[in-house]
């Protein structure tokens, strides 16, 4: 190796990993700062944190996740199927606080930036990758998740991020390996696995083996979903049923499936942000359609929280998938492959595709910047954000009066 090559190699390694490392660090700092601010100001958007804190406490003592907040003797595995939450047990044992769960969630979201920003660095260089990383960690879906506090779906984010990167790189086995544990996160993610299997089969259709094996993976996802909602959830639920329903027609009268999917109009906000999150050109990647099962159950459901794009945790799971679709389209456009993408979008002539692909990488970051004032973390610009609530002393006094292991009934 030449002296020049030896001298520049450390710099090349530094620039190769720096955007991903800084993205993870930026995300962790932003999220944890926001969570600590919420904690200090007693900002409680829902009862989810109390529910999952009780589950973590039970797991930390090697007990079933009995959650009195949901009802006497209520087993949380009968609500949603999320056995992966057992991983919270050892952490909670050493740091027994609801704030622990918030920090765990913040770190899991931040870490999910690593594989995708690393991939972006390989494809587009450190500068564009840095822009992508900023857009990723400040994305609409993640802000809503952090603000609404802990939810089990956060465990799916690193899995989907690494699966997305593997898909773009054409590593089918790795894609399936990273996706398979999704069945341990939440019951509906079996349908996401089904979609991933179908997409892999489509992408590998030129080979019998590459076409057939992903179909078995898709079947695994369907079977996992059916077994979970028909057998496992009813077994843990006191009423012997699945606590939720795919029927979203309640309260909507006699409407068609299309009307249920597209009405009310606030759903278009989610669609618009998804398109921007994929840099527009990501729609041409088959990976974009991995979001379809999640979008379907949300839009067909009757709970208006499902349709919101600014708040709650429901959009977080879309973010790594959308960036994966963008990077997949970018790779193929940049290489000027005569692929399904170039044929499907023939209005973009061959010499324009690399330029359009490069510009598209900045769209998610631009969307994050434009929508920032409407998103939860904008609160951090307020001078009083994170100040200790005036009610804190009263809360601490009341807590001191409650005996250990006593149950207290209250509202939010």
Model-based region annotation:
Residues 1-33, 172, 212-217:
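Start-transfer (signal-anchor) and selected internal transmembrane alpha helices
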Residues 1-7, 192-219:
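Perimembrane helix-loop-helix junctions
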Residues 115-118, 135, 154-178, 193-197:
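Specific aromatic-rich, kink-prone transmembrane helix
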Residues 289-347:
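Hydrophobic/aromatic-rich transmembrane helices and adjacent perimembrane loops
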Residues 267-295:
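Hydrophobic, aromatic-rich transmembrane alpha-helices
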Residues 51-75, 83-84, 206:
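Extracytosolic helix-loop segments that constitute the early lumenal/periplasmic catalytic or substrate-binding loops
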Residues 21-25, 127, 218-222, 333-375:
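Signature aromatic-anchored transmembrane alpha helix within multi-pass, membrane-resident enzymes
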Residues 99-123:
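Transmembrane-helix motifs of polytopic, lipid-linked glycan transferases
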């Amino acid at each position: 190796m030449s002296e020049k090559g030896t001298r520049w190699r450390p710099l090349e390694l530094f620039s190769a990993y720096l955007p991903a490392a800084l993205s993870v660090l930026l995300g962790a700092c932003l999220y944890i700062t926001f969570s600590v601010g919420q904690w200090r100001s007693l900002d409680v958007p829902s009862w989810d944190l109390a529910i999952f804190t009780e589950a973590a406490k039970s797991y930390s003592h090697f007990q079933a996740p009995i959650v009195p907040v949901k009802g006497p003797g209520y087993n949380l595995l009968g609500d949603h199927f999320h056995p992966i939450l057992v991983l919270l047990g050892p952490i909670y044992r050493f740091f027994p606080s609801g704030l622990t769960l918030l920090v765990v969630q913040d770190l899991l979201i931040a870490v999910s930036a690593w594989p995708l920003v690393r991939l972006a660095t390989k494809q587009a260089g450190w500068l564009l990758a840095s822009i992508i990383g900023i857009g990723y960690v400040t994305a609409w879906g993640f802000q809503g998740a952090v603000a609404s506090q802990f939810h089990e779906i956060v465990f799916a984010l690193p899995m989907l991020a690494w699966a997305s990167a593997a898909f773009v790189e054409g590593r089918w086995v790795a894609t399936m390996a990273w996706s398979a544990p999704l069945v341990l996160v939440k019951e509906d993610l079996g349908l996401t696995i089904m979609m991933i299997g179908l997409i892999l089969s489509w992408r590998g259709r030129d080979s019998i083996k590459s076409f057939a094996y992903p179909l078995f993976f898709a079947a695994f996802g369907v079977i996992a979903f059916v077994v979970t909602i028909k057998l496992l959830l009813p077994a843990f639920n006191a009423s012997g049923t699945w606590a939720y329903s795919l029927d979203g027609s309640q309260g909507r009268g006699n409407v068609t499936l299309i009307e249920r999917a597209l009405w009310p109009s606030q759903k278009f906000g989610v669609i618009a942000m998804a398109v921007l999150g994929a840099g527009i050109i990501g729609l041409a990647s088959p990976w974009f359609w991995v979001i379809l099962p999640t979008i379907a159950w949300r839009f067909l459901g009757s709970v208006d929280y499902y349709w919101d794009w600014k708040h709650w945790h429901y959009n977080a799971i879309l973010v790594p998938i959308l960036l994966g679709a963008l990077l997949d389209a970018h790779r193929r456009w940049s290489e000027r492959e005569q692929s399904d993408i170039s044929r499907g979008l023939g209005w973009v002539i061959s010499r324009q595709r690399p330029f359009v692909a490069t510009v598209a990488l900045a769209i998610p970051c631009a969307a994050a910047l434009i929508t920032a004032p409407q998103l939860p973390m904008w609160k951090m610009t307020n001078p009083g954000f994170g100040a200790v609530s005036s009610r804190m002393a009263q809360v601490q006094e009341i807590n001191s009066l409650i005996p250990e292991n006593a149950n207290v009934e209250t509202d939010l």
